Regions:
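Bacterial N-terminal signal peptides that target proteins for export
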Residues: 1-10
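Bacterial N-terminal signal peptides
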Residues: 9-20
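His/acidic/aromatic-lined binding-pocket segments of jelly-roll/cupin-type domains
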Residues: 127-130, 136-139, 182-183, 190-191
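Short beta-strand His + acidic residue motifs that chelate non-heme Fe in jelly-roll/DSBH
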Residues: 147-148, 193, 199-204
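Structural motif
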Residues: 188-189, 197
């Protein structure tokens, strides 16, 4: 009996702090959120006739200044050029600056980000992007392709675009990726990209549709709902 009482006392001593810690802190949400397959399909259907479309379904308050978004993304067939390929295509057309990752007018109007380099390597990839305050977790649901990840942004331009529903918030883009690696992503694969890490699509033979699970800190408007699924 004494041993039983001791075990109960020890269990209580362990569990009570855990239960107290598990309680939502004041001001944090106390309810869960459901996003149905029907809602996801409804948003996805509006994207299928576009080259690239990325929309969040909802911005959900998850407490302590964090929000969680579910991105629904469609990309049709595409192939990204290297700096060398773009320069060859642009030779003689007066668009060499764009081949290096940007153009003079845009560079003059925006704040540079990433490393600035007059002549990036020929194998650098166009379309590099990073997000300042958002992690992305891709889950491929249809199609697939070759993504590029990691490395550094060269000749980027800072984006402060931050509409209520995202999709991503401020970041660095418009430049080229140096030192990235390519990865194949197909149905069922998952890619997790922390804030500040380069990601993009190098080659999509037909299309790719994916869900992006996006915890963000301090950049989205909690409670925002995509107009396509918002209650009228």
């Amino acid at each position: 009996m004494k041993n039983t009482a001791l075990r109960v006392s020890l269990a209580t001593a362990v569990l009570i702090p855990l239960l107290v810690y598990a309680q939502p802190r004041p001001g944090n949400p106390t309810t869960a959120t459901v996003i149905t397959k029907a809602e996801i399909d409804k948003i996805s259907a509006t994207e299928q006739n576009q080259t690239t479309r990325d929309e969040n379904a909802r911005v959900v308050d998850i407490g302590d200044g964090w929000s969680m978004e579910l991105g629904i993304v469609h990309r049709s067939k595409q192939h990204v050029l290297t700096v060398g390929q773009a320069a060859q295509a642009a030779r003689g057309s007066g668009t060499a600056q764009a081949a290096r990752g940007g153009n003079a007018q845009a560079a003059a109007q925006t704040t540079p980000c990433g490393e600035q380099m007059a002549n990036p390597p020929a194998d650098a990839l166009q379309g590099a992007i990073t997000h300042d305050n958002q992690t992305e977790g891709y889950y491929i649901v249809s199609g697939g392709g070759t993504a590029f990840i990691d490395g550094k942004v060269v000749n980027g331009r800072r984006s402060t675009n931050n509409p209520d529903g995202g999709p991503n918030g401020p970041g660095c883009g418009g430049g080229v990726a140096v030192g990235s690696r390519k990865v194949e992503l197909n149905v069922g694969d998952v890619l997790i990209v922390p804030p500040g890490v380069i990601h993009g699509w190098f080659d999509i033979p037909d299309h790719v549709d994916y869900l992006s699970f996006r915890p963000s800190h301090g950049v989205m408007k909690n409670g925002w709902v995509n107009p396509t699924i918002a209650s009228k």
